[in-house]
């Protein structure tokens, strides 16, 4: 799946046959299709053909930087670059990132809504969990509540716990049962209409160490002060 945006603002989509009807429902009207699945050529020859319609020595930007996707293998990209040496292949990540920073009112509303849903579910979770439940049980309740409250899907959910704290926040929830003095963290990424929220919450079980409470309160106060800026 490729989207070609010319300097003059014209947009062309290159998509596999299975994606044609979906793209036709958007504002994009200039669409070219390749028959897929085709492991030997998933659109790369079509992409090369379109690039060749541009003047030689043109700059062809690809998203090559942080948090970007080529939508092709590195091997395929290097082959295209080798076959089209009369063009300048450059990293356009900075352009895309600068555009992504600008949000329309509708985009902001989508982000606000998915964040509000997730915050509400986090707040209600305290009434549904207790000592003796496992990380997996708690995570399952949380995920179900997210869906029931309107998010489209959960991109990821990590969960960890331990006495006075935890040592990682990247793994899936385990069968570990929450005991006295445990701190549980849930870190989630939920989406709505393609827009994303990413934040976490901590929950204390039983008698929590005073140093842990003090550290939490300091972080809370620092966050609140920052939000006032």
Predicted feature residues:
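Active-site neighborhoods and metal-handling regions in enzymes and metal-associated proteins
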Residues: 1-229
């Amino acid at each position: 799946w490729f989207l070609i945006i010319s300097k003059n603002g014209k947009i062309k989509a290159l998509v596999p046959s299975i994606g044609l009807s979906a793209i036709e429902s958007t504002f994009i009207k200039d669409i070219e299709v390749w028959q897929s699945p085709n492991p030997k050529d998933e659109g790369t020859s079509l992409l090369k053909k379109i690039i060749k319609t541009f003047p030689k020595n043109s700059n062809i930007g690809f998203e090559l930087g942080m948090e970007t996707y080529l939508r092709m293998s590195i091997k395929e990209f290097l082959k295209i670059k080798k076959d089209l040496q009369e063009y300048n292949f450059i990293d356009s990540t900075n352009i895309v990132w600068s555009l992504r920073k600008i949000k329309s009112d509708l985009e902001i509303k989508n982000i606000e809504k998915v964040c509000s849903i997730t915050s509400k579910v986090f707040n209600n979770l305290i009434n549904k969990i207790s000592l003796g439940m496992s990380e997996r049980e708690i995570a399952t309740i949380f995920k179900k509540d997210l869906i029931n409250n309107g998010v489209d899907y959960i991109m990821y959910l990590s969960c960890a716990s331990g006495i006075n704290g935890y040592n990682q926040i990247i793994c899936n929830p385990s069968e570990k049962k929450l005991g006295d003095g445990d701190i549980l963290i849930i870190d989630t990424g939920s989406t709505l209409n393609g827009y994303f929220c990413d934040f976490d919450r901590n929950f204390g079980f039983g008698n929590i160490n005073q140093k842990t409470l003090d550290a939490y309160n300091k972080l809370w106060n620092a966050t609140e002060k920052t939000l006032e800026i």
